[in-house]
Curated annotation (Swiss-Prot):
Needed cofactors: Mg(2+)
Sequence positions that bind substrate: D116, G117, S118, S119, N208, K274
Annotated EC: 3.1.3.11
Descriptive protein name: Fructose-1,6-bisphosphatase class 1
A GO MF label: magnesium ion binding
Length: 334
């Protein structure tokens, strides 16, 4: 494959589809640069004294890792001065982050999970960053949380970075899904996969099976049928994969198919799932759909959900289209 940089790809996309104006290109280049900085911090590990907890909790009530806070600060500081954003929101912050008055205000809203899978940090398992870009309302002067509450179908860009054996950046601007790999010697993002496609059928599924006793009947039925293998109703064997890092699980599914499930369960009836809609489920759903897959909450398309609050949680079923449609049909039939 000819070496195509991220910048070249964005410029050519604008020429072909007129969907990446200069401000949006700047935003994506800044986010990509911030991901390089995070990758460098992750790569240092104990040598950089960035492992362990920070003795604090985020808005979700989760104990923060040092790298959670570092990654959040990197993304905020990289993006607030460029003039391309109206405001930002993060998993690590209870309220939105306003652009300081000394900087010009742009026309986009950026949401992110700065370090997904951070429970894996100390054991050297792949983690990543997830981000979503929305358009701000015309003439916006003082952004509020309500301005972020747009359905996922309104996203103009979604992407994630995986910090693993290689550092990769996967994104969609609404015209397919592209993967860029960080050339560590040159410091540049180089396209390594174009128009990624998820196979419609699969023999792999990803779910935290330790919660099986709490699953609702549709999820239990679906997983039990897969576990029955060739002697069961599916008449084929399945393998289970679970990394406990959404970016790593989804990246595997993008490359070789599969279904990722994080359902609601009976432990906390008032909590509809664990994953956050705005900066986890929505961007991943946009990417998966653009790669030919499907993404639902068990009842409806994730991208059609109208958010009610910034840190809203949802059940998630995404990946190979036929499998997502099957488990969704079990939910609708209950």
């Amino acid at each position: 494959m000819k070496r195509i940089s991220l910048t070249q790809y964005l410029i050519e996309e604008q020429r072909l589809h007129n969907n990446i104006p200069a401000e949006l290109r700047l935003l994506l280049e800044v986010v990509a640069r911030a991901c390089k900085t995070i990758s460098h911090a992750v790569g240092k590990g104990a040598l950089g004294e960035v492992l362990g907890t920070a003795q604090s909790e985020n808005v979700q009530g989760e104990v923060q890792k040092k790298l959670d806070i570092i990654s959040n600060d990197i993304l905020l500081e990289a993006n607030e001065w460029g003039g391309h954003l109206a405001a930002m929101a993060s998993e690590e912050m209870e309220t939105i982050h306003q652009i300081p008055n000394r900087y010009p205000m742009g026309e986009y809203l950026l949401l992110f999970d700065p370090l997904d899978g951070s429970s894996n940090i100390d054991v050297n398992v792949s983690i990543g960053t997830i981000f979503s870009v929305l358009k701000a309302a015309d003439g916006m002067q003082a952004p509020t949380e309500a301005d972020f509450l747009q359905p996922g179908s309104k996203q103009v860009v979604a992407g994630y970075a995986v910090y693993g054996p290689q550092t990769v950046l996967v994104l969609t601007t609404g015209n397919g899904v592209q993967c860029f790999t960080l050339d560590r010697e040159m410091g540049s993002w180089v396209m390594t996969q174009r128009d990624m496609q998820i196979p419609a059928n699969t023999k792999e599924f990803a779910i935290n099976a330790s919660n099986a006793r709490h699953w609702h009947p549709p999820v239990k039925r679906y997983v039990d049928e897969m576990l029955a293998g060739t002697t069961g109703p599916r008449a084929k064997d399945f393998n289970m994969r679970w990394i406990a890092s959404m970016v790593a699980d989804v990246h595997r599914i993008l490359n070789r198919g599969g279904i990722f499930m994080y359902p609601a369960d009976a432990r906390e009836p008032d909590k509809p799932g664990k994953l956050r809609l705005m900066y986890e489920a929505n961007p991943m759903a946009f990417i998966v759909e653009q790669a030919g897959g499907a993404a639902t909450d068990g009842q409806q398309r994730i991208l059609d959900i109208q958010p009610e609050k910034l840190h809203q949680r949802v059940p998630v079923f995404l990946g190979s289209k036929n499998e997502v449609e099957l488990v969704t049909s079990y939910h609708k039939a209950k």
